[in-house]
Amino acid sequence: MKADTPTDKASVLVVMGVSGSGKSTIAAMLAHRLHWLYEDGDWFHPKKNIEKMHHGEPLNDEDRWPWLHAIADWIDATRHSGNHGIVACSALKRSYRQILIGDRRDVRLVYLKGDQDLIERRVAARADHFMPPALLDSQFAALEEPTADERPITILVAPHPREIVETIVKKLNIDEPVGSSADRAPR
């Protein structure tokens, strides 16, 4: 992957965290607030990954590589089309984030950080998600919190989602929504 021209302005955000941290909710609300494109990383999972998780089996790295590369392709398509976008993706390990962000200086990481007890309660309350609460322990075990060199925007998940979104917008130093020229970038 070749390095891009450094910039402080994000063109794509990767909203990361364990299952139940609020990635999809926050990313969708943030995309609406900024008028940016939105994709949920779950939409990129091949059927076999979804079936595996539905049966309570944690994914391994071999399951994740094609999924991560599909998301990285969306990130590049969004950037190269001149749009701005947000993708919700667990991105638990540094090696996963390297695939998604790498040397792309205009792709920023938003880390939704939360206490395991709070997140367990959230996951237990969800009825319509393919990932069962039993897999949450494996997500926390796999989590490698982002380090300063990854330039994360770290946000605690306890506040109301609207408050979280406004905090992210302030930390990004975005005065006005940039907007996007399309509803969704090509996959």
Where are each of the predicted segments found?
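Extreme N-terminal, non-catalytic leader segments
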Residues: 1-11
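Conserved lysine of the Walker
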Residues: 23
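Glycine-rich phosphate-binding loop used to anchor ATP phosphates in small-molecule kinases
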Residues: 62-104, 112
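Conserved phosphate-donor/acceptor-positioning beta-strand/loop module used by diverse small-molecule
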Residues: 103-123
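Small-molecule kinase domains that catalyze NTP-dependent phosphoryl transfer to phosphate-bearing small molecules
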Residues: 125-167
